[in-house]
Amino acid sequence: MSNEINYDRRHFFASAAMTIVAAQVGMIGSADAESGKANSANLPAIKPGTNTSFAALKQTDAGLLNVSYAEAGPANGPAVILLHGWPYDIYSFVDVAPLLASKGHHVIVPYLRGYGATRFLSSETVRNGQPSALATDIINLMDALKIDKAIVAGFDWGGRTADIMAVLWPERCKGLVSVSGYLIGSQESGKMPLPPKAELQWWYQFYFATERGQAGYDKYRRDFSKLIWQLASPKWNFTDATFDRSAAAFDNPDHVAIVIHNYRWRMGLAEGEAKYDELEKRLAAAPAITVPTITLEGDANGAPHPDPSAYANKFSGKYAHRNINGGVGHNVPQEAPEAFAKAVVDVDAF
């Protein structure tokens, strides 16, 4: 689910003035997005769920990890890195990747730490799920693959990771596509309470704060994840086969530890690592994103998410927002692969 939004929304709800200003910027961005300047009209049409597999996955050592990733398109094409969320995996992009490859992009789709066949190189490494650690993983992967610059695109955890990369390493990011917009938060912003109905939507983070929650997620991780899928995308009639393909990624031996630490860290209930302190300090200031960006939102997103006007002024470079209609929920790339791929191609042309 769009866990990243939790603390960001607390930050945005606390600033009504920001929302008013952002609304004006957001309208400008949306108009530009629909102005016909894009060069992606010839993307091949594809029905969601057309593809069910990637080519053989690859592995590479990168920083603290041995990363498992899918690859598509020409190796010398402009790079695109697609980043999944929780509880999802690389199959969120199984239809997006071939669309981008058909446009000549070199597409990399990694399993994040704690997912799929991605593994820590050392048993001594802290199983740390804090946001800056995940973003650092992707920079390390780019280094390992000798990718100097890429478009980064994602949703949920992946959207937040992409946002963080764009803030901390803008020189490595040619462009950004982020579902639900600006997802950068901090432990401090997480201390701000929300109205009761809003807090209710985050039931799972309070559950994860308990030992019972950790044990429950471990024991019922597939049932738990399927429930999140259903809540976050209430109009998406995914099949058991579709879910099972992704759910296999949650069998990673570090999965539960990473997920639980991620949420406990956000609530200030778990410590991070000192080596990320300076990065988190920079992120806590909620800096603007300067790289060219397109943000997306599904019209049936069942996960809590901010209104686009609440974050539009956090993008100071070329920017557009697009609402994706047709019953599209939280997992935009899997539910609306053409729209997601179009955003990537279009931001490349900004």
What is the predicted function of each stretch?
Residues S2-I20:
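N-terminal secretory signal peptides and thylakoid transit peptides that target proteins
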Residues A31-A33:
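Boundary at the C-terminal end of the N-terminal hydrophobic targeting segment
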Residues A38-A56, N66-V67, A72, A79, ...:
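Flexible "cap/lid" subdomain of the alpha/beta-hydrolase fold that forms the substrate-access gate
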Residues K58-A62:
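Short acidic-hydrophobic surface loop/beta-edge motif
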Residues A72-A117:
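Conserved HGGG/HGGXW glycine-rich cap/lid loop of the alpha/beta-hydrolase fold
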Residues G85, D156, Q334-E335:
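Conserved acidic functional residues
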Residues V328-A336:
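Catalytic histidine-centered segment of alpha/beta-hydrolase-like enzymes
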Residues A343-F350:
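C-terminal alpha-helix
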